[in-house]
């Protein structure tokens, strides 16, 4: 009798574990790297002196806008850290936080100025992406303006 109860309890536990609803999202960058995350938030610099941020978007209950942001990010080319350059965040900057269970990675979008050498917009990814640690994302589009437009509509 005890064996049956333990067996049924075990079956119910397996069933509940299988039914657990964890929705993850995937960004497949144009260069083939794949990044999985659970939620995404967008922040702006609220106070430049104190370097505080304010959240302007969260992917929770905002699936349509999240899909639009992902569709912009998948166009980015992932390159090594050598393409990044120092920049100071200001009120025009965006921070995209990608949340997983145990960690958070961030894409820093400092300015909307094309690089003279590559003629592309450079954004810094802080975290591990593929086999690279803290790579640079290159884009033909001004993602800061486009993401702000998506968030504001």
Each model region followed by its residue ranges:
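C-terminal motif of bacterial Sec signal peptides marking the signal peptidase cleavage site
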Residues: 15-18
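Function-determining sites in protein domains
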Residues: 20-153
């Amino acid at each position: 009798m005890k064996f049956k109860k333990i067996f049924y309890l075990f079956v119910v536990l397996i069933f509940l574990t299988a039914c657990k609803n964890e929705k993850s999202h995937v960004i497949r960058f144009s260069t083939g790297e794949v990044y999985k995350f659970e939620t995404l938030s967008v922040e702006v610099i609220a106070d430049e002196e104190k370097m505080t941020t304010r959240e302007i978007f969260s992917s929770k209950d905002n699936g349509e806008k999240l899909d639009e942001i992902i569709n912009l990010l998948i166009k980015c080319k992932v390159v090594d850290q050598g393409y990044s350059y120092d920049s100071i965040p200001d009120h025009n900057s965006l921070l995209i936080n990608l949340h997983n269970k145990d960690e958070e990675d961030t894409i820093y979008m400092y300015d909307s100025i094309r690089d003279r050498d590559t003629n592309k917009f450079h954004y810094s990814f802080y975290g591990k992406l593929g086999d690279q640690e803290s790579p640079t994302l290159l884009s033909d589009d001004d993602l800061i303006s486009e993401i702000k437009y998506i968030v504001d509509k």
